[in-house]
Amino acid sequence: MPIVEIHTDQYRVPLETPLSDSTHGEMSDFGLVVVRLVDERGQIGVGYTYTVNNIGTGAIWKIIDSDLVPLLQGADPGAIDTLWKKMWWRLHFVGRGGMASFAMAAVDIALWDLRGQRESLPLWRLLGGDSAEVPAYAGGIDLDLSTQGLCAQAEGFLDQGFHAIKMKVGRARLSEDVERVSAMRELLGPDFPLMADANMRWSTDQAIAAADALEKFDLFWLEEPIVPEDLAGHARLGRETRVPIATGENLHSVHEFEHLMTYGHVDFPEPDAATLGGITPWIEVAKIAQDRGLPVTSHGIHDIHVHLLAGVPNASYLEVHGFGLERFLKQRLQLKEGKAIAPDSPGHGVALDLDGLRPFRQATGSSHD
């Protein structure tokens, strides 16, 4: 049953409330690229990727529409590994990461969704999982909030049933971060899992100083203290600090993750299927981590990642933060007693409200066999 139709759409979606972190500054909107693959039976696989502040979204859509659609037209959608390698090598001269990996991700997620439709299995079962439940944490994008506002947000997360929370760090002065983390620890209690995310704000020396200052608050992990490509810096963090390190959301290939785990240091590898190239490389990163005795976590698109974490044996926490996309989902992620529950419908079960998104569409493409 070959692919007979391919539809691609690009959107620029305003956020209801602007967000802020130490790297991107204020974020007022996000970009979304959606791919729909249709086979001869009329079954549809949906995939998507996203950007911050809509930067690069048009280029990602163009890569898919101009360079990947011709490769996919008439192809066997069940040959996911083969198609992934063909996409990689088709784009490698201008890609090997970056926007090429974003483009591949939207296609690869659609292929896996279509496989689930064809086999009448939810993605988490297709991957070999035996439980749909995954521990989840609330990912706050809250660097601009006052300490009072930060704690009020945390109380809202507790009311929603979360049993773990992540906050942002990376303020202008380390003393501000210490004060804010201290307030959160006092609010949440000594045993509540609390993560902190610096969004690559620091140099290695600054990160070591921050880890030392924050160690007494027993963070579950310190996320992205430095840029992820700095292998020597991560090796130093592993040797010279005692706070667990999570990183990887800004790595765009399996090779980069393997190098980080081999030559650098990470306690919680953090691949993002929407930016890494899709589900196929995400699973490979999880296997590499498992071979090293490391748990894997996630970043963004929690409606996809809940399946992936439920499908691997070395899952840690699922980050829950939809970046505004949840407004356009017909069914939102289900939470129960601090755990996210992957849908039991075939594929990934993400049903986008395309009518609701239509006012924000900036480009569209369609190809028929």
Q: Which residues are covered by each model-predicted region?
A:
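N-terminal basic, low-complexity leaders that serve as flexible interaction/assembly modules and, when applicable
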Residues: M1-P70, P359-R361, G365-D369
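Conserved, mostly hydrophobic/aromatic
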Residues: I3, G42, L68, V107, ...
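Flexible C-terminal active-site loop/helix
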Residues: V4-L15, M27, L32, H299-D369
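Metal- or metallocofactor-binding catalytic centers and their adjacent structured scaffolds
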Residues: E5, V38-R118
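Hydrophobic faces of well-ordered beta-strands that scaffold small-molecule active sites
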Residues: G47, A136-G139, I165-M167, L194-A198, ...
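Glycine-rich, aromatic-flanked loop segments that form ligand/cofactor-binding clefts
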Residues: D108-I141
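Metal-dependent enolase-superfamily TIM-barrel catalytic cores that perform enediolate-based chemistry
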Residues: G128-T241
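Shared catalytic-loop signature of beta/alpha-barrel
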Residues: D212, D218, E229-K339
